[in-house]
Design a protein with these regions (language model features):
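Short glycine-enriched loops at secondary-structure junctions
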Residues: 43-46, 141-143
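Conserved class I S-adenosyl-L-methionine
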Residues: 34-45
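Class I S-adenosyl-L-methionine
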Residues: 9, 13, 71-199
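Conserved SAM-binding loop of SAM-dependent methyltransferases across substrates and taxa
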Residues: 46-61
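Conserved SAM-binding motif I beta-strand of class I
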Residues: 65-70
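Structural motif corresponding to the C-terminal cap of alpha-helices
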Residues: 15, 19-26, 54-58, 83, ...
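S-adenosyl-L-methionine
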Residues: 1-29
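Short helix-terminating capping/connector loops at secondary-structure junctions
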Residues: 25-36, 60-63, 89
Length: 199
């Protein structure tokens, strides 16, 4: 649990200045009470990031509406119950839906913290198709490409026969392709180490 808090804290440390820069550059409208900043957290799980982003942005005076999407009805119910206890259901909502087919409205910002495997790709596709101006995505595991690398032709076999090297190669390939696709459709992309491997 402590690792998750460190990840959320680091994510917020990156979100706020990036968001402020996008607002100052006119890429995202300055949030107001009538038109709050819209954020969708894709693959939110227990919504640590969803609640933290909501509460932190509100604490610095930013009008915001946050929607959390997770496939599990139990997560939706738990998160909506917490929102009700906090009295914030007018500015935060949760839905139990697949990311690829969510009914969530378009958003200014799409975030995803460790949406597993191809759920990260679903989050990117949803954000791009919905016209999100800012995406902050911290990918998780890359199992889909790992399976496809089982029978790697030479010279790749020299790398993929070792588990840790195969995993790293899969991570690099997947994230490089994601970044290239985002660049092709018009996004400026930065790839950074989000938080050290020990977390």
């Amino acid at each position: 649990k402590n690792d998750k808090y460190k990840q959320v804290e680091e994510f917020l440390r990156l979100l706020v200045p990036t968001l402020n820069a996008a607002i100052e550059a006119g890429q995202i409208s300055k949030p107001s009470k009538d038109k709050p900043l819209s954020i969708v957290d894709l693959g939110c799980g227990h919504a640590y990031l969803t609640f933290a982003a909501h509460q932190y942005l509100r604490s610095i005076g930013m009008s915001v509406h946050v929607t959390g999407i997770d496939v599990r009805p139990a997560s939706r119910d738990r998160n909506n119950e917490i929102a009700a206890k906090l009295g914030i259901t007018d500015t935060i909502t949760f839905k139990a839906e697949e990311i690829a087919s969510t009914t969530a409205n378009r958003s200014d910002v799409a975030i995803a913290l460790h949406a597993c495997d191809t759920a990260t790709d679903d989050a990117i596709a949803w954000a791009v198709n919905g016209g999100a101006k800012l995406l902050l995505i911290a990918p998780c595991c890359h199992h889909d490409i790992q399976k496809q690398m089982e029978q790697s032709p030479e010279p790749w076999g020299a790398i993929t026969k070792f588990g840790v090297m195969k995993e790293r190669m899969g991570d690099l390939l997947t994230d490089a392709l994601r970044a290239q696709i985002l660049r092709i459709v018009g996004y400026r992309v930065e790839i950074i180490e989000f938080i050290g491997g020990e977390h």
